[in-house]
């Protein structure tokens, strides 16, 4: 089954990985800490913590760092003052965007998020304005060159919902969010190490963009991801490999 290439998106993100690694790790640690605080430090009994750990491992975070974050969250600390908030809006070209945040000051966060939208030619919407366009699911992505038949057999047996092979040979394994970490663990045990793995909001219908609009949308996403309170940004933009290469 062919589809748009998530691998192109990953390559774009990897190009900025070194500069943003510290910020990415900060966000991952925050998610682990909050997940442990809300649901306890036992990952087997805490699906959210299990998913957070799986994502951290996929981003090459050390087990020691992960364990410290779990202990910190389960023990209770300043993270008790942090709350989760979600903002929805539209970017250039009418692209739908969801922004998940963790903050100890809602007024500060909404001001920063609104400013990013406004400066980039978008606008912050109301709750529910775009969320209906997305489905929450786990996506485990593999670079071109992986044994497609073997991966498909293991993934389906482990409970994957769908497997999509893209034109460039990259493969996405889709899972129910609750099964995400278990399926990823099975794949790792069988020797399939992913290039990216996350529980995300996946748009059912993608927005097709020209190069100019794609650059503006990417700039907005970068602005949002650079905000300290922002954990994740999701959009329905279809960043094809051709667009990624043109944007550079």
From Swiss-Prot:
Subcellular location: Cytoplasm
Superkingdom assignment: Bacteria
Keyword entries, A-Z: Cytoplasm, DNA-binding, Transcription, Transcription regulation
InterPro entries, per the entry: Integrase-like_N, TACO1_YebC-like_2nd/3rd_dom, TACO1_YebC_N, Transcrip_reg_TACO1-like, Transcrip_reg_TACO1-like_dom3, YebC-like
Coiled-coil annotated spans: none
GO molecular function: DNA binding
A Pfam family assignment: TACO1_YebC_N
GO BP of this protein: regulation of DNA-templated transcription
UniProt GO cellular component terms: cytosol
Family per similarity comment: Belongs to the TACO1 family.
HAMAP family listed in its UniProt record: Transcrip_reg_TACO1
Name of the protein: Probable transcriptional regulatory protein FTT_0655
């Amino acid at each position: 089954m062919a589809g748009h290439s998530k691998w192109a998106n990953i390559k774009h993100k990897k190009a900025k990985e070194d500069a943003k690694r510290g910020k990415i790790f900060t966000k991952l640690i925050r998610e682990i800490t909050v997940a442990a605080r809300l649901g306890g430090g036992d990952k087997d009994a805490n699906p959210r913590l299990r998913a957070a750990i799986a994502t951290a491992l996929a981003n090459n975070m050390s087990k020691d760092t992960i364990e410290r974050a779990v202990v910190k969250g389960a023990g209770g600390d300043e993270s008790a003052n942090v709350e989760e908030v979600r903002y929805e809006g539209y970017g250039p070209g009418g692209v739908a965007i969801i922004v998940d945040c963790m903050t100890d000051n809602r007024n500060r966060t909404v001001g920063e998020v609104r400013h990013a939208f406004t400066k980039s030619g978008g606008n912050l919407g109301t709750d529910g304005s775009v969320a209906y366009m997305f489905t929450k699911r786990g996506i485990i992505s593999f670079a071109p060159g992986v044994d497609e038949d073997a991966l498909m057999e293991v993934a389906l047996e482990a409970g994957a919902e769908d497997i999509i092979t893209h034109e460039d040979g990259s493969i996405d394994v889709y899972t129910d969010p609750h099964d995400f970490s278990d399926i990823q663990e099975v794949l790792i045990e069988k020797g399939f190490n992913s290039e990216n793995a996350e529980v995300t909001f996946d748009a059912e219908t993608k927005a097709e963009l020209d190069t100019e609009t794609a650059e503006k949308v990417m700039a907005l996403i970068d602005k949002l991801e650079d905000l300290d309170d922002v954990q994740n940004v999701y959009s329905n933009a279809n960043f094809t490999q051709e667009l990624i290469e043109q944007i550079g």
